[in-house]
Each structure stands twice: as structure tokens, then as C-alpha cells.
């Protein structure tokens, strides 16, 4: 049996874990504080939250960790749950997506750990401790497009899988019912209730069809695949899941990186722009700029195959199984 720790922020970690777990040839138990129900997991253990204290103290343990608030009851219960899982279930390995503290805690209990890396600036001590402790590192992007300096020390145990999309293997579904000139997809990892400039874009471009999907528009759908395949242009942030899904659909994309810890999305945006896979902009385009984007969208054929989404989840699963079988 393999454990799979899934971070609760947003939906990207859950989608990635679900995609990978579906290719693992043994029971996989999810450990998470997120709302996660997926048949690929033999069990989901709900972990206590460790971020409910409005005034957490000494959260980084003097710079050694990222999140270990002093005397936090939620953290204490959470770690006790993980310890009980290891003691009673004896996992062959645990995947951590993502947490420095969980990685180190599990390794201290003698459990082989596979860590999912994220883009950005990860040269700080906590990240490097986790990467050194890991038995393997999964980098869910193409090796030829992004190899940050902070990862070079760990390359011998790093598997670059390509972008992991929940839609890998699905046939394109293009239909007028789902068509839009501009499809704006927002994730669940940002600021809840924050206004989105796309809400007025339809009024500014009455000659075009603008569709918004996500919490910012109150129009979340579980399966945006037909929308992604049918759009002339898709607008996304630079989260790993969003980029992988856009790559799987193969449509032209406008990528607007959002502010995230460790400059995660900025790094991905820079990679996409340098590789000419998407139009990357740091701010919301003007109305005239949108018209220009749409005028050129028809002749745009991004080489999304370079993001290597085909088979990425399966490659991650094989790397996980290799550690579990040692």
C-alpha cells in the first residue's frame, strides 16, 4: 500500500494526485484536509487542519521549517494522525504533494518518501532539506524547458514527468454548445470572492463570446474539458494543473501568472513565454489588446506537445512504484 499526502490549498493538488493514483498498481490511501472523493483511492483519511489559529506563533521554527506553529492543537493532532497511519498501516512509501514538514516527519519514521517539486524559487533551507530527505522527486514539467539551479543537486533522483493533467488520454471534444471566443478559467487557490476583470469583458467586447468558469464567476464545473477544447483562446493562471490542462487541450492560451509563494507562477510563466507556448502577460490586457489577440488566434498553433502531458501521470506512477518496491 502507498500513502499519498495531498495539500488542501486549491484543487490542483487533488486533481494531480487523482490523476497519478489512477496509474498506481496497488492500493493508494489519500491523506488530506481537502474535500477529496475519488474511486482511485482505496481510502481517504481526513487530517486535522493546522491553520485555524488566527495568531500562530513561531511558525517556521527559526527558519528551519515553513509551517510548524508553536503549541498548535491542530498541528499536534495532524502529526499524530500521520504517525498512527504509519504505525498501523505500514505504507511501502508515501507521496508528498506538498509539505516540507510532512516529508521530514515521515522520513524520520523511516518511511520512503517521494516529493512533488514545484516551480519557483526553492533554494531556501526547508525546501532543500525536504529534497535531500526524499527518495525521489517528481518534477511535473518537461526537463528540456525548465531546470532551475536549486534542483540541480537533486537531478540523479528527479523524474521529469511533463505536465500532469487530469484530461490526459481523453479525445478532444469540440462542440458549438461549449464554444467561446475567450474562455477564462480561474482556479480555487486564489483569494475567495476577489473580483475578476473578465466579468466585464463581455460588455467591452460585445461582438465576441466570453465565458468564465471558476469560483470568480460562480460557475464552477467539474468537467471543463469540452469548454477547453472548444475555445478560440483560453485564459488561465500559471498553476501547474491549469497549464497541463490547457496543454492537453492544445488550444491557444493567454497565461496571466498570479502571485503565489516562492514566485511559483512567475517561474512557470517565464518558461512558457521563453518556449513560445503561450502568450504570457503580467496584467490583464486592454480591450484593444484582446481584439488583437483574437485576430491572431486563428493562425496560432502552439506546440503544446512539448509540455509532455501525454503519459505524464503514468510516468509519475512508475517513479512512485519504483521507490515502493525497493
Regions found by a protein language model. Give the residues of each.
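A nucleotide-sugar donor-handling region in carbohydrate enzymes
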Residues: 133-192
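Donor-nucleotide binding loops and adjacent catalytic segments primarily
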Residues: 21, 166-233
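A donor-sugar binding/catalytic signature common to diverse glycosyltransferases
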Residues: 93-98, 224-267
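A short, glycine/small-residue-rich beta-strand->loop->alpha-helix junction that serves as a flexible
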Residues: 5-18, 124, 192
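C-terminal amphipathic helix plus adjacent low-complexity
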Residues: 291-326
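Short amphipathic alpha-helix
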Residues: 13-24, 36
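Conserved nucleotide-sugar phosphate-binding/catalytic loop shared by glycosyltransferases and other
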Residues: 7-8, 26-75
Amino acid at each position: 500500500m502507498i500513502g499519498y499526502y495531498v495539500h488542501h490549498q486549491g484543487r490542483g493538488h487533488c486533481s494531480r494526485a487523482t490523476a497519478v493514483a489512477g496509474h498506481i498498481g496497488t492500493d493508494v490511501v489519500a491523506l488530506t484536509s481537502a474535500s477529496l472523493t475519488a474511486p482511485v483511492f482505496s481510502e481517504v483519511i481526513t487530517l486535522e487542519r493546522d491553520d485555524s489559529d488566527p495568531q500562530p506563533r513561531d511558525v517556521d521554527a527559526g527558519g528551519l521549517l515553513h509551517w510548524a506553529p508553536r503549541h498548535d492543537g491542530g498541528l499536534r493532532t495532524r502529526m499524530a494522525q500521520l504517525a498512527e497511519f504509519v504505525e498501523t498501516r505500514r505504507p511501502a512509501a508515501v507521496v508528498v504533494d506538498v509539505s516540507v514538514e510532512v516529508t521530514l516527519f515521515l522520513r524520520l519514521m523511516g518511511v520512503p518518501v517521494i516529493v512533488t517539486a514545484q516551480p519557483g524559487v526553492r533554494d531556501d533551507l526547508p525546501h532543500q532539506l525536504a529534497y535531500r530527505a526524499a527518495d525521489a522527486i517528481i518534477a511535473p514539467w518537461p526537463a528540456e524547458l525548465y531546470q532551475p539551479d536549486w534542483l540541480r543537486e537533486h537531478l540523479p533522483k528527479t523524474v521529469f514527468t511533463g505536465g500532469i493533467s487530469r484530461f490526459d488520454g481523453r479525445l478532444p471534444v469540440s462542440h458549438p454548445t461549449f464554444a467561446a471566443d475567450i474562455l477564462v478559467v480561474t482556479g480555487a487557490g486564489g483569494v475567495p470572492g476577489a473580483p475578476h476583470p473578465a466579468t466585464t469583458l463581455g460588455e467591452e467586447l460585445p461582438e465576441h463570446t466570453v465565458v468564465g468558469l471558476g469560483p470568480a464567476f460562480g460557475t464552477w464545473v467539474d468537467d471543463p474539458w469540452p469548454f477547453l477544447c472548444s475555445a478560440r483562446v483560453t485564459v488561465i493562471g500559471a498553476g501547474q494543473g491549469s497549464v497541463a490542462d490547457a496543454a492537453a487541450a492544445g488550444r491557444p492560451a493567454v497565461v496571466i501568472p498570479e502571485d503565489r509563494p516562492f514566485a511559483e507562477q512567475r517561474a512557470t510563466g517565464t518558461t512558457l513565454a521563453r518556449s513560445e507556448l503561450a502568450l504570457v502577460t503580467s496584467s490583464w490586457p486592454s480591450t484593444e489588446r484582446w481584439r488583437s489577440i483574437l485576430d491572431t488566434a486563428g493562425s496560432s498553433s502552439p506546440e503544446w506537445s512539448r509540455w509532455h502531458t501525454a503519459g505524464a501521470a503514468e510516468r509519475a506512477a512508475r517513479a512512485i512504484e519504483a521507490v515502493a518496491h525497493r
